[in-house]
Amino acid sequence: LVDSSTNIFWTRALLGVGEAPLFLAGTRVLVHWFSAEERGSAIGLFNGSASLGPALAPPFLLAIMAWWGWRDMSVLVGVINLLLAVIWIVYYRDPVSGEVSAPTPAHSARASLRSALKDDLGYLLRQRNTWAATAGYTGVVYLSSLYVTWLPAWLEKTENLSVIQAGLLSAFPQIFSFLGCFMGGRLMDMISQRGVAPLVACRRTVVLSMLACAILTGTLALQPGSIPAIVLLTFTLFASGVAVSCGWTLGTLIVTENRVATLEAIQNTGASLGGVLAPLLTGILATRYGSFGPAFILACGIGLVSVVMYHKGFSGRTLKS
C-alpha cells in the first residue's frame, strides 16, 4: 500500500515496534516451561528460528517477487504471520492453569509498575553482571547482524554475482547459524547434566564460540577465494549461532524468574545497538575503503571485546537474591 521511501521507513519502524516484545515474551514462556538444566536446547531452538527465516526466505521470496512483485510478496508474508498469531492465541496455555483471577484495580496496577521499576529495573541497573551481559551481547549481535545485512552485498561485490545469485548463496551459511543456535543450547544442557552449574556451562560456551567467531571474521578480511570464503562463512555463522543462543540463555540464569523479562529487555537494548551499528559502520567503512576488509577487522575487534566481557566482566555471583 505504500508509495514512497518515507512510508516504507515508517512501516518498517512499526514492524520493529511489533517485533520488539517477541523475544522477551518467548523467553519468559520458555522459563515457565523448562528448568535451568534443560532450557538451553529450548532457547537455542527458539533463537535459531530467527536464523532459519533468513535461510529459507530468499529462494521462496525471490521466486514470489519474480512472479508477482514485491507488493504481493509482502502481503503473503503478512498473511502467514497473522495465521501463526491466531494459532498461538488459540492453542498456547501456561504450564499451570488455574481459575481466572479478578481484574487488578487500576491503582494496584500503577503501584505494581512503580514497584517493578524500583525493585527490578533499578536493582538490575546497579549490578555489574547486568552490564557485562549487555555489553557482551551487544558484540554478539553486532557480528550476527553484520552477516545478516551485508552478506549478500559482500558476495555480490567480491564474487561478481547477480543480486539473485548472491541472495540464494547467502542463504546457505544462514542454515548453519540456525544449527549453531540449536547445538549451542544442546551443548549447554549436556554440560549441565554432567554436574557443571548451568551458569558456568553457559559462560564457557559463549566465550569459546565468540572467540571462534571473532577469529574467523578477522580471517575473512584476508579476502580468500570464493570456496574458502563460503567454508569460512559456514563455520563463522555456526559459531555466531552458538553465541547468540548462549548469550540469550545467560540472562535467564543470573536472575529470578520474575526478573527475566526485565533483564532480557536491558540486554536487548544492547543487542539493538549492535544491530544498528553493524550495518551502519560496515557501510561507512566499505564505502570509504572500497573493501569489506576494514569492516571485518572492526567486527573481529568488537567480538574480542565481547569475549573479554563474558570472561572477565562477571562478578561470579547471580542476581537471584
What are these regions (language model features)?
Residues 46-96:
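Helix-loop-helix hairpin linking two adjacent transmembrane segments in secondary transporters
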Residues 99-134:
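Juxtamembrane intracellular "pre-TM" segments in multi-pass secondary transporters
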Residues 252-289:
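A late C-terminal transmembrane helix in Major Facilitator Superfamily
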